[in-house]
Amino acid sequence: MVSVRHMANLTKNNRRLTRFYGLIFGMDELWNEWQNSSAAFYITDGYLNFNCLEILPVMSRPASVRIDHIGFMVSKQECETKLAAWDQAIKLEQSPQDGRYEDWRFDDPEGNLVEIAARGWGTESNTKLPLLRHTAIHAQDHERLADFYKLVFDMKEVYRKDIAETNTKAIYLSDGNFSIALVQNSPIETKGFQLLGFHVQSIAEIEERLRKSPPFLYPREPRIEILRRTSDSPFKEHYLRDPDGNVVDLSEEGWEV
């Protein structure tokens, strides 16, 4: 079964970012015995592999602090067969063979980086909260992008939301565990991957951890707080910004899958 098993952020301080996600969301270090790299710092909720990837002076793609890419567990052959049925040519590029988890990569029709791995990302099946269960992608054409992920990765459409006042349109897809929102005319200005979403047992508990955890910020950096949106949003009501400024949604009920 094709499944989302990986997300990655680009950061200028991977130690600080992994410390934050460990203290606040209970993510643990995932040791990759094959990849000798100080840039890649893998952590996990037990199911999904999350890479806090340090930006290096020389990288194969333009780099900035952001939520950078998504990874699917699927074979090259299956992925290539599905890509061949798409209405434009998309070619797989082999990832560097340096011990990293993914085998191949490509850009989706709107330029978002997607990685694939036949053997997965070194994680198991875990259902204990908190769990990283959602991301949102800015879409120029949410219908077409949804068709792509349905075709190539067998994702199912589970929900739609249209907001007439802002002409925001969102399609929510699922692989059975992980949710992806494709949002056209998004209220978040960031292009590409716009946010991460954690299914949590209690938002109050996350708030308590933010207050009482050991330090994960530096002097004069603003305190991280849980914020709230109005109901006319394609995203969850509660969210925060991680130490790099990335948006992280919080939900006690989770996302429809």
Language-model features, listed with the residues they occupy:
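Vicinal oxygen chelate
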Residues: 12-15, 65-66, 70-113, 139-143, ...
